[in-house]
Amino acid sequence: MRLLVGLGNPGAKYQGNRHNIGFMALDEIARRHGFSPWRRRFQGETADGSIGGERVTLLKPLTFMNDSGRAVQDAASFFKLGLPEIIVLHDEIELPAAKLRVKVGGGIAGHNGLRSISAHIGNEYRRVRIGVGHPGVKELVHGHVLNDFAKAERPWVEAMLEAITDNADLLVGDRDSQFQNKVHLALQAKGFLDKSDNGAK
């Protein structure tokens, strides 16, 4: 079994925010892979299904970003999951827009959702870091992630969500490098990444 956690803030006012791309990814996975309807539990919303023969539960914490770890801990305890079975999808300002990286453990780069999860369950869970770009100045970061994607950004966002969903079987199958490369190839094919970017770190 795998627990896929998408990070974001609940409520309509945050729905289109860059900080909510984790929620967006899970919504697309649930829709395209025929998951059960969303229901409230574990201080969040969950949907159940399978991808590539693997049982998967999707979790969107409704605790607000800074307390995401409480929901993740509740779900992990209930399903008796180890950290390698937990995959967190989140926005990453340290990556340019339309780039994606998968890693296990490591630093949290100031991301309060990751900070909360690490405090509750430990650090060695898998992260899908979805680049949303950096505003260039530290003081502008808060506003950047809590603003909606600009109209000009929406095509790459849609392409990213589609590529993540198309290749979700690789992600839940622990084939992280293949997943990362397939997503990058899809974004390259649509012109959102330079051909020289092979998805390597």
Swiss-Prot record:
A single cellular component GO annotation: cytoplasm
Subcellular location field: Cytoplasm
Keyword RNA-binding assigned: yes
Catalytic activities: an N-acyl-L-alpha-aminoacyl-tRNA + H2O = an N-acyl-L-amino acid + a tRNA + H(+)
Alphabetical UniProt keywords: Cytoplasm, Hydrolase, RNA-binding, tRNA-binding
Sites annotated Stabilizes the basic form of H active site to accept a proton: 91
Domain of life: Bacteria
CDD domains noted in UniProt: PTH
Any one Gene Ontology BP term: protein quality control for misfolded or incompletely synthesized proteins
Positions annotated to bind tRNA: 14, 64, 66, 112
Entry's EC annotation: 3.1.1.29
Active site: 19
Top-level enzyme category: hydrolase
Xref: InterPro entries: Pept_tRNA_hydro (IPR001328), Pept_tRNA_hydro_CS (IPR018171), Pept_tRNA_hydro_sf (IPR036416)
GO MF, any single term: tRNA binding
Major localization listed first in the record, in broad terms: cytoplasm
Claim: Translocase is one of the keywords in the record: no
Entry-linked Pfam families: Pept_tRNA_hydro (PF01195)
Site (Discriminates between blocked and unblocked aminoacyl-tRNA): 9
Assembly description: Monomer.
Described function: Hydrolyzes ribosome-free peptidyl-tRNAs (with 1 or more amino acids incorporated), which drop off the ribosome during protein synthesis, or as a result of ribosome stalling. Catalyzes the release of premature peptidyl moieties from peptidyl-tRNA molecules trapped in stalled 50S ribosomal subunits, and thus maintains levels of free tRNAs and 50S ribosomes.
Similarity remark: Belongs to the PTH family.
Alphabetized NCBIfam families for the sequence: pth (TIGR00447)
HAMAP family: Pept_tRNA_hydro_bact (MF_00083)
Protein name: Peptidyl-tRNA hydrolase
